């Protein structure tokens, strides 16, 4: 393989004369340019270390900054963001970009404030396991025609969206002082016909033109759906529709929640793929596995150890570095919550995703491990221009080790990425590595790899203005150019490391402070310093001024290099070094004080190196702490945690209950409901009976729908009913108030066909009423047959058995349908249960005296429904971040549909018979940490066995003393109850 690589390089040199390639731009702006090595922003090469974030899944704008600060602190310089059309458009030609969490200008402002670039992804189609893939639900009833093509019907629907959201994206481009550096066209749209007249090609041209019309000038991108097709690259069969920067999506883990030993098989073909299909462009992994979604009936994220492992981040992300990737987006980095009815049927309420940052905004070990790579790429400028020197198993003394060898053609810096050839191996292997350096060919002995570990070995690596490494078998975490050059290494505890300074004096003296003792060995290439990594922080001060920190991996997890600048790019002299806390959000130096803002769960020691001899004091979240100075120039102290604070959450009591299924009664007045009188549908899927009963045809798209069908006579013995509301969605039916059957939902079935059997004694000679109540788990994605996102929802067909026909059907759904009567929470928050339509879930609702004193623990004894409400007070300390959730459980065999509403937000869809989720977190802003909270639970039984819960309990996940303000006035996000009688 090394010989082949050499031949390739000779051929490349003959062909081009030089390995350098001048930067290319799109002709609209030179602020963002690219070549085959990397992206350049404002003339500076950038390693795009990006995390996927969906603001819709966290409907509290202030918390976007919380997440962004955590990403910035953990080495990210960019976020990738979907903009869901569905969230901003409740009805045709109506857009909301200003109300509550719909205000995306705040998203851009917070990203800029946090020091993050933005990759904008506005579709029109997004997927992201969101309902209808992000299409506006009003358009997903069939009226779009052939979606994701040049179909005129589709074009007329999506173009206004792109023009509106595009204007805001354009206003926030890097060219206008904003953070947007790339703009994605569409999403995972597979190009299968390379013909300029192909409908998809025309469509991609239309999307490009629409963004251009909106004023977007930054380079365009796209994300290939795995290595299945080759789509929209200027370097491969470009007949139109191609983007400027080609990207690839890859989820290669093949991990199993049930079996942590399965999967973990690396793909080592990214380099070849990009060389074949986008060779003039930098390698861009537009979505790379940060976790994986879980379906109804699957596993819950917290129990999926294989997806949560920091080893995954270590091995897989470094493999991408070895493949020459320089644009790297982790999907998801923060998943959030599918609150309301925003989920596609393939996922449940939680969209935690097993991501590095938990749904509760807590930092997982996976994020701590990811940080080690993020901080490394931030300072490793030579990594941004490399060629593939070679790869394979011949670089080491043990052929069980695979090596990527990258070389910078200008500086000759080398990057050797080593891992087990069998990536799932748990063997501990010691080997030597053959390297090429400015001092010639060398061999580094005694490199150790634990199972499922990878390392980046550097050669001729600059660590400051006057210092370089000839090589190091310890991994570089970061370096800083301060009063002296400061270098930070890390290794697993107990592993051996060695490094050699380049062109350093032979008689260097050093002093060690800590548990890792250094030894020096003179070689022909210089002095090799060797050590065995101990636990904690070890500092080594050399007589030439260089300061080296040696950290074990777990200590490195709690190391931060907070920038002293606000820009996403951070030079080695623009950050300081902090060891110890759970999180460092930011740092600044004012006179003789370094001011640090951060979070801590437990009291910890803290060490700060600023390189400023005038700094004598440390403040933590505004409070000075006692410190002592070390002999090598740092300050050490202790920062407080929250371990001594008792969190006492109230028990939930004083429940009130009301009937939320009054429509079961044949005497219920439905005269104001929508009459189902259509004999044709806008949908191309033909109904199984008439009139059309698709809910979307009548303007009801989300949540529970209720149908009431009337017929005369006593001849009917039953009814054939087919319902399609997404996998796991159940439904139930009542004839004249008597339960007659239904379907409890199945995670493997998108629709159900059931025969309802009527009891003759329940029939009346005139005006029989069949009431059908349906659950809903979302609109399908584009890939679901027959017509993707436009697959109908509701009753597909309903016919009587034994004679007679239905004489009238009426439907009721969410209050107001497409009117969006609660614009703050938006068009997907509510469904059509009576309690929802009446606003019983909203703050300020006054329960009537007629309400029952009953709790969800009592439940219902038959096929009934109840809406339970209570309130509780929280009074957490002001400087605490305490993620809080609601724990539910139900007796085995319970078949019911349960929803949780916290201060009006539907933040839990619980199906106890399907699962897996039973603990539902609420972010601050949805829940008041210091104030009054309104909690509502709707529950209806899917069978006549009834339903109840056996646990309804507030639960604290953890507690952190925080420098972020989580206790604000959230009133603007929680509009209260208003009379809704008209929607009865």
Swiss-Prot record:
Residues 1-23 form the signal peptide. Disulfide bonds join 257-304. Its EC number is 3.2.1.23. Glycans are attached at residues 197, 276, 391, 421, 434, 517, 602, 677, 715, 720, 759, 805. It catalyses: Hydrolysis of terminal non-reducing beta-D-galactose residues in beta-D-galactosides. The active site is at residues 188, 287. GO terms for molecular function: beta-galactosidase activity. Substrate binds at residues 82, 127-129, 187, 251, 353. GO terms for cellular component: extracellular region. It is found in: Secreted. It comes from the Eukaryota. It is an enzyme of class 3 (hydrolase). InterPro entries: Betagal_dom2, Betagal_dom2_sf, BetaGal_dom3, BetaGal_dom3_sf, BetaGal_jelly_roll_dom, Galactose-bd-like_sf, Gly_Hdrlase_35_cat, Glycoside_Hdrlase_35. Keywords: Carbohydrate metabolism, Disulfide bond, Glycoprotein, Glycosidase, Hydrolase, Polysaccharide degradation, Secreted, Signal. GO terms for biological process: polysaccharide catabolic process. SMART domains: BetaGal_dom2. Belongs to the glycosyl hydrolase 35 family. Cleaves beta-linked terminal galactosyl residues from gangliosides, glycoproteins, and glycosaminoglycans. This is Probable beta-galactosidase C. It comes from Aspergillus flavus (strain ATCC 200026 / FGSC A1120 / IAM 13836 / NRRL 3357 / JCM 12722 / SRRC 167).
């Amino acid at each position: 393989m090394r010989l082949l690589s050499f031949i390739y390089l000779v051929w490349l040199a003959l062909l081009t004369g030089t390995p350098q390639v001048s930067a290319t731009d799109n002709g609209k702006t030179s602020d963002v340019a690219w070549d085959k090595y990397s992206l350049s922003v404002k003339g500076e090469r950038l390693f795009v270390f990006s995390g996927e974030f969906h603001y819709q899944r966290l409907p509290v704008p202030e918390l976007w900054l919380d997440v962004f600060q955590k990403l910035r602190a953990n080495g990210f310089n960019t976020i990738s963001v979907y903009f869901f059309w569905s969230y901003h458009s409740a009805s045709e030609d109506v857009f909301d970009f200003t109300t509550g969490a719909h205000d995306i200008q705040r998203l851009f402002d917070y990203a800029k404030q946090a020091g993050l670039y933005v990759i904008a992804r506005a579709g029109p189609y997004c997927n992201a396991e969101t309902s209808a893939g992000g299409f506006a639900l009003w358009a997903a009833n069939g009226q779009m025609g052939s979606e994701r093509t040049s179909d005129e019907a589709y074009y007329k629907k999506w173009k206004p969206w792109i023009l509106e959201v595009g204007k805001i994206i354009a206003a926030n481009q890097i060219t206008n002082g904003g953070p947007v550096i790339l703009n994605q066209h569409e999403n995972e749209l597979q190009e299968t016909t390379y013909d300029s007249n192909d409908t998809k090609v025309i469509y991609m041209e239309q999307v490009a033109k629409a963004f251009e019309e909106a004023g977007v000038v930054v380079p365009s991108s796209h994300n290939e759906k795995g290595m299945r097709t080759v789509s929209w690259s200027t370097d491969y069969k470009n007949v139109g529709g191609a983007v400027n920067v080609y990207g690839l999506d890859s989820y290669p883990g093949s991990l199993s929640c049930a079996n942590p030993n399965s999967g973990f098989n690396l793909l080592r073909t990214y380099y070849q793929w990009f060389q074949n299909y986008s060779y003039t462009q930098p390698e861009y992994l537009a979505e790379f596995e940060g976790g994986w979604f879980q379906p109804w009936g699957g596993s819950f994220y917290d129990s999926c150890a294989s997806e949560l492992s920091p080893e995954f981040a270590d091995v897989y992300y470094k493999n991408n570095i070895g493949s020459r990737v320089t644009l790297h987006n982790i999907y998801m980095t923060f998943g959030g919550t599918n609150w309301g009815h925003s989920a596609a049927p393939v996922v449940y309420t939680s969209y935690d995703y097993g991501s590095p940052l938990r749904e509760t905004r807590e930092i997982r070990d996976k994020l701590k491990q990811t940080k080690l790579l993020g901080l490394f790429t931030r300072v490793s400028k030579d990594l941004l221009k490399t060629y593939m020197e070679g790869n394979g198993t011949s670089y080491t003394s043990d052929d069980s080790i695979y090596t990527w060898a990258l070389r910078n053609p200008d500086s000759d810096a080398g990057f050797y990425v080593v891992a087990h050839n069998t990536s799932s191996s748990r063997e501990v292997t010691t080997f030597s590595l053959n390297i090429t350096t400015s001092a010639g060919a060398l061999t580094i002995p005694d490199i150790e790899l634990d199972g499922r570990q990878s390392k980046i070995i550097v050669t001729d690596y600059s660590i400051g203005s006057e210092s370089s490494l000839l090589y190091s078998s310890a991994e570089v975490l970061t370096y800083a150019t301060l009063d002296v050059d400061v270098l930070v290494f890390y290794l697993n505890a107990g592993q051996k490391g060695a490094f050699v300074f380049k062109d350093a004096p032979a008689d260097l003296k050093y002093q060690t402070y800590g548990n890792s003792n250094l030894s020096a060995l003179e070689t022909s290439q210089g002095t090799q310093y060797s050590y065995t990594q101990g636990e904690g922080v070890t500092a080594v001060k050399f007589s030439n001024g260089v300061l080296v920190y040696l950290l074990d991996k777990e200590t490195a997890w709690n190391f931060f290099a907070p920038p002293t600048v606000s820009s996403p790019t951070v030079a080695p002299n623009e950050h300081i070094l902090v060891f110890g806390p759970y999180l460092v959000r930011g740092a600044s130096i004012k006179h003789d004080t370094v001011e640090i803002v951060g979070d801590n769960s437990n009291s910890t020691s803290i060490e700060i190196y600023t390189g400023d001899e005038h700094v004598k004091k440390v403040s933590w979240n505004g409070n000075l702490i006692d410190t002592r100075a070390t002999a090598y120039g740092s300050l050490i102290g202790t920062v407080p945690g929250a371990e001594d604070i008792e969190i006492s959450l109230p028990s939930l009591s004083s429940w009130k209950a009301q009937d939320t299924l009054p429509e079961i009664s044949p005497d219920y007045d439905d005269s104001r409901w929508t009459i189902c009188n259509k004999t044709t549908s806008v949908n191309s899927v033909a109904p199984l009976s008439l009139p059309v009963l698709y809910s979307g045809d009548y303007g009801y798209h989300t949540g529970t729908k209720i149908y009431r069908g009337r017929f005369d006579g006593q001849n009917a013995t039953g009814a054939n009913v087919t319902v399609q509301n997404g996998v796991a969605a159940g439904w139930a039916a009542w004839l004249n108030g008597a339960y007659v059957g239904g379907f409890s939902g199945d995670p493997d079935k998108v629709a159900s066909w059931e025969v309802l059997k009527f009891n003759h004694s329940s029939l009346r000679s005139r005006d029989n009423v069949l009431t059908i109540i349906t659950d809903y788990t979302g609109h399908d994605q584009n890939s679901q047959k027959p017509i993707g996102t436009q697959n109908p929802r509701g009753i597909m067909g309903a016919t009587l058995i034994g004679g007679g026909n239905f004489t009238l059907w009426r439907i009721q759904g969410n209050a107001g349908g497409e009117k969006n009567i609660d614009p703050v929470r938006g068009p997907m928050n509510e469904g059509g249960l009576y309690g929802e339509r009446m606003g019983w879930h909203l703050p300020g609702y006054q329960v009537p005296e007629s309400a029952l004193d009953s709790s969800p623990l009592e439940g219902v004894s038959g096929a009934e429904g109840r809406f339970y409400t209570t309130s509780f007070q929280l009074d957490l300390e002001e400087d605490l971040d305490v993620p809080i959730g609601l724990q539910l459980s139900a007796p085995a065999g319970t078949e019911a549909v349960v929803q949780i509403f916290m201060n009006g937000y539907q933040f839990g869809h619980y199906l106890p018979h399907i699962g897996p989720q039973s603990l539902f977190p609420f972010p601050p802003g949805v829940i008041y940490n210091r104030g009054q909270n309104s909690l509502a639970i709707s529950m209806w039984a899917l069978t006549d066995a009834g339903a109840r819960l056996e646990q309804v309990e507030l639960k604290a996940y953890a507690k952190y003393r925080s420098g972020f303000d989580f206790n604000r006035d959230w009133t603007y996000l929680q509009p209260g109850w208003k009379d809704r009688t008209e929607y009865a």
